Design a protein with these regions (language model features):
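Intrinsically disordered, low-complexity linker/loop segments enriched in Gly/Pro
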Residues: 1-33, 38-42, 46-48
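Glycine-centered loop/turn motifs
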Residues: 20, 54-57
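C-terminal functional regions that serve as terminal interaction/effector modules
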Residues: 41-44, 49-50, 57-195
Length: 195
């Protein structure tokens, strides 16, 4: 996991949230230790595996955010996982996503396109894949949050490595993809006429 890529996301968003994942079972009423810690910029959420326990002060130190820069970054720390997403490694509703061999840029955002098993399109900003660049193999799955909104679960083997809410598909994206589709059809017809 590339922490520098996560730092860049958080600084661009002006927001970082540390999230503590409590243990599965408490031990004899003692204050339970944190099982896993996560970090989010509000769109992507990544585990902080292999690092010591972080708090607001330590994440600012790691991200080189001094007192002068602190007003440009909202830092929060939640003692529990947010209720909408599923943070488990394996989820029975996981829908494998096929990454389309097609990337595009729209309004300055580089986009990755995925298709779910029903043929529906999911799009994420490419910058949210950067933390996974050190791994050769990652698989993506569609999950639904408690409100029925889709999000992408990124797995490395059987281990959850990130959760990403998709890019909103608006008119501009639909029109751009439609124009690409139409232009490709015209080009294919012209190629056929040459034969």
């Amino acid at each position: 996991m590339k922490l520098k890529a996560i730092e860049k996301l958080c600084k661009a968003a002006g927001f970082v949230c540390l999230i503590d994942e409590p243990p599965l079972m408490e031990d004899d009423g003692a204050v339970p230790p944190v099982r896993r810690q996560w970090i989010s910029d509000g769109v992507g959420c990544y585990p902080l595996d292999g690092l010591p326990y972080l708090d607001e002060e330590s994440i600012c130190a790691i991200f080189d955010v001094d007192a002068k820069k602190r007003d440009k970054l909202v830092v929060s720390h939640k003692p529990t996982l947010p209720g909408g997403m599923d943070f488990t490694d394996m989820h029975k509703g996981d829908d494998p996503l096929e990454e389309l061999k097609f990337q595009m840029s729209l309004g300055g955002d580089e986009l990755h396109l995925f298709r779910d098993s029903a043929g529906s399109l999911l799009v994420i900003k490419s910058v949210y894949r950067k933390p996974f660049d050190s791994w050769k193999e990652v698989e993506c799955y569609k999950r639904l949050d408690k409100e029925g909104r889709p999000y992408v679960a990124v797995m490395n083997g059987c281990i959850l490595r990130g959760l990403i809410y998709p890019y909103k598909i608006g008119e501009q994206l639909v029109e751009t993809l439609g124009a690409v589709y139409n232009a490709a059809g015209v080009a294919a017809e012209q190629e056929q006429m040459k034969i």
